[in-house]
Structures are given as C-alpha cells and as structure tokens.
C-alpha cells in the first residue's frame, strides 16, 4: 500500500503566496516541477484529507505535456499542450498507445478537455478560443471566452471551466455562454490555481497547479469539502526521468475508477482514495 503523507505547507508561507499580486498570472504553460513551493492547499484546512493506494500503473506517453484527461467507452482521451505540440488524442488504456490524434495549429496552446453532450471540447491557454469535435475528431465548431483557459469538465448538462484563479464558471453546453460563476474557498479563503477539472460523483475535482493536491469542491457552494494528497506519486519514477507537474484526472463512472497522471509522466495511475484525516 502506498499512502501519501499529510499536508506540510506552512501557514506563514501560505499567506505570503496568497497575497502576492502576481499570483494569478503565473505562466501555466511554463510550469516547472518544484517551481512553486507554496500552494493554496492549506495546512489549516479542517476538511478531510485523502491519500491514495495505487491499483494499477499503465504506460503513458512521456512526451505528452498533459493538460486534460477523460475516460469514456473504454478509452482515455487526452489533451496536450506546448506550442507546436498541442493535440487531442484517443489513447488505449492498457498500452498507452495513441490510437487517434489531431494536432492544434500554432499559435494555439492546448489546455483542458471534456466530453459533453457527445461532443469533445478542448480549451486553449491564452487564445481565448475553444474547439469542438465530434467523436471522430472532426472539428465541428469553435467558441470564445474572455479569460485564460485552464481546465474544463461537464456535470452532465453544463460545462464547468477554470482559468487559474479561484473562480469556476458554468457554461451552457449548447451556446457556451456563461451561466454563473462561483469562487472556490476553504475556510473562507480563496483557493487559487484551479487547473485540470473532473466531475466525480457530484463533486468537482480540481488539480491545484504546481502542487500534488486535488481539491474536492461542492458545485453548490464552491466550498472545498476535502483534499486529495498525491505527494509521492512522482517519486515512482527514477530521478533521471525528466517529469513535470501532476496534471490529468479521469474518472470511469461505470467501474468507479480514478486515473491520474502528469506532464511528461511515463506512467498513468489508477488509484483508490484512502482517508487520512477526518473532519475535526
């Protein structure tokens, strides 16, 4: 059993980072592992904390700068980033083999992806442009949004989008118009750097960029209801392997399986959550 440790973030360091005026404008596309030592993952949180147990480890393309990940119909769908390397892929789970791929032209920098109303949606980082595909990867439309694009998921009927701040926005899945927006908080404090998103059992799972943590968010209140500590996963790789940060959450609803990976990670992990700390 591999279970991650408790939060080790210092409250004093946390306050410094939370108050930085440039904290929301850090360049997501130039992330480097360990570049941010503090995070919105709060040591003072009174919410439950979950570690993990690795169920399976699957091959993953080590050249993929993973920005979005979903599971559907027995396959993984992955969005990758970097200028000139951004793509949307269909991937075989057991082998990691890329079965289908469509590349994004420059200057687009690929970001989060989701499947909603039988359409694949892919965001871009700073181009304020999203792409719509059918299941055969034919582009069938585009849409615009006024912010940066980071993560996106679907609650079954609406899109939910992050832009690296503490704000989540709900979009009409047909018109792509913003329906509502909501700040994400823990103990009244904003949780910034919301990145890759996944809708899991009525909660929004949000990877906190630059950290090993995933926030479990209530879509009703915007409050964090729990934290997932995935520290230790990246240590599964030899130090000579040039990996980047944790990024990529996919949920298999039919079989209740949770998958996670990271940018340039050579493995994708199926994990089971293990409660570490209960609500005080």
Predicted regions and their residues:
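Conserved beta-strand positions in repeat-built beta-propeller and related beta-rich domains
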Residues: 77-83, 120-127, 161-165, 206-210, ...
């Amino acid at each position: 059993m591999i279970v991650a440790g408790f939060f080790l973030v210092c409250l004093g360091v946390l306050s410094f980072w939370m108050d930085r005026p440039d904290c929301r404008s850090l360049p997501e596309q130039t992330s480097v592992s360990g570049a941010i030592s503090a995070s919105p993952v709060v040591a003072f949180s009174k919410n439950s904390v979950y570690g993990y147990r690795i169920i399976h480890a699957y091959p993953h393309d080590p050249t993929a700068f993973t920005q979005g990940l979903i599971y559907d119909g027995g396959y993984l769908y992955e969005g990758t980033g970097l200028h000139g390397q951004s793509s949307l892929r269909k991937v075989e789970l057991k082998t990691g083999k890329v079965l289908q791929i469509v590349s994004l032209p420059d200057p687009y920098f690929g970001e989060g992806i989701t499947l909603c109303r039988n359409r694949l949606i892919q965001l871009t980082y700073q181009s304020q442009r999203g792409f719509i595909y059918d299941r055969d990867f034919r582009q069938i439309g585009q849409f615009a949004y006024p912010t940066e694009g980071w993560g996106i998921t679907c609650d079954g009927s609406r899109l939910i989008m992050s832009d690296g701040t503490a704000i989540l926005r709900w979009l009409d899945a047909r018109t792509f118009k913003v329906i509502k927006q909501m700040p994400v908080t823990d103990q009244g404090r904003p949780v910034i750097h919301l990145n890759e998103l996944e809708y899991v059992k009525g909660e929004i799972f949000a990877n906190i960029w630059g950290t090993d943590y995933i926030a479990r968010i209530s879509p009703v209140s915007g409050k964090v209801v729990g934290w997932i500590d995935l520290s230790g996963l990246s240590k599964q790789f030899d130090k000579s392997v040039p990996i980047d940060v944790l990024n990529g959450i996919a949920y298999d609803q039919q079989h209740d399986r949770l998958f996670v990976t990271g940018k340039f990670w050579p493995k994708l992990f199926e994990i089971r959550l293990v409660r570490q700390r209960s609500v005080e």
